[in-house]
Amino acid sequence: MPELPEVETVRLGLTPALVGERLSRVAARRPALRLPIPVDLVQRLTGKVVGSLDRRAKYLLLRMIDGPVALIHLGMSGSMTVGPLAGHAEPGPHDHILFETEAGLRVTFRDPRRFGLITLAEPETLDDHPLLAKLGPEPLSEAFDAEVLVRRLNGRQAPIKAALLDQGVVAGLGNIYVSEALFRAGISPLRPAASVTGAWAEALVAAIRAVLGEAIAAGGSSLRDHRQTDGALGYFQHRFAVYDRVGQPCPGCDCDVARTGGIERMVQSGRSTFFCGRRQR
């Protein structure tokens, strides 16, 4: 599933193609993805000018001037690509939503597994929308620091890995970047969340910020479906320290792979966790 860096990469790529442009045509090519597509989506977006394109957690917020906000989630396999209308290939079977601009560009929302979604919200009540209302702070914003993290983890005895995947604790984090951040901070994924305080919390916040920033700069991680808006792959997967590297040497210490087995894998809440048992405490 695309995590914060992948969604932010898509936002950055779509912004010059959409913001300030009028939508000359919008097409919904099926009635539903994960949720039903609003029956008035085409009518309410066609002819509108895009005022801004923001991100909240793993959601894209396409804001119209004098119009609604389109909330988009890429689901497990979704991507959004930009191309010229002239000479553009016919939409494929997995190209479900099309946005065409008066400037002659088409943005295609493709989602083979159909776990993504698009819906509409009113700008005045956007923060109270059911998909957004309970989200935690953005980890790259000034609203997120060690004090905030400690407060949100207070009283939680669940493992820190599970707590960080809770979108109500911190918004936008997923399995890849939580594993990578915990490794950088030297924190075991099994450690009780409420015990991450003081210098540990400072280290974790710094690690989260660093990992996310580096991943965005690399265009995200392309393990299966993620593509940038020009169709290019992200390449942060080549810089993983622990994720999907079971049995390989740990880059943070002098692990003896023959003795320790290298990077380990375990399953937490149905998700694979990768870590170094020697480095992370």
Curated annotation (Swiss-Prot):
The active site lies at P2, E3, K58, R271
Q: How is the cofactor bound?
A: Binds 1 zinc ion per subunit.
BP GO annotations: base-excision repair
Q: Which domain of life is it from?
A: Bacteria
Locate the coiled-coil region(s) and give their ranges: none
Q: Name one GO molecular function term.
A: zinc ion binding
Q: Which reaction does it catalyse?
A: Hydrolysis of DNA containing ring-opened 7-methylguanine residues, releasing 2,6-diamino-4-hydroxy-5-(N-methyl)formamidopyrimidine; 2'-deoxyribonucleotide-(2'-deoxyribose 5'-phosphate)-2'-deoxyribonucleotide-DNA = a 3'-end 2'-deoxyribonucleotide-(2,3-dehydro-2,3-deoxyribose 5'-phosphate)-DNA + a 5'-end 5'-phospho-2'-deoxyribonucleoside-DNA + H(+)
Q: What is its EC number?
A: 3.2.2.23, 4.2.99.18
* Keyword entries, A-Z: DNA damage, DNA repair, DNA-binding, Glycosidase, Hydrolase, Lyase, Metal-binding, Multifunctional enzyme, Zinc, Zinc-finger
Q: Zinc fingers (FPG-type) span which residues? A: 241-281
Positions annotated to bind DNA: H94, R113, R156
The region annotated as signal peptide is none
Q: Which Gene3D superfamilies would you find in this protein's record?
A: 1.10.8.50, MutM-like, N-terminal
Q: Which cofactor does it need?
A: Zn(2+)
* Subunit composition and interactions: Monomer.
Functional description taken from the UniProt entry: Involved in base excision repair of DNA damaged by oxidation or by mutagenic agents. Acts as a DNA glycosylase that recognizes and removes damaged bases. Has a preference for oxidized purines, such as 7,8-dihydro-8-oxoguanine (8-oxoG). Has AP (apurinic/apyrimidinic) lyase activity and introduces nicks in the DNA strand. Cleaves the DNA backbone by beta-delta elimination to generate a single-strand break at the site of the removed base with both 3'- and 5'-phosphates.
Q: Which family does it belong to?
A: Belongs to the FPG family.
- Name of the protein this chain belongs to: Formamidopyrimidine-DNA glycosylase
Give the gene that encodes this protein: mutM
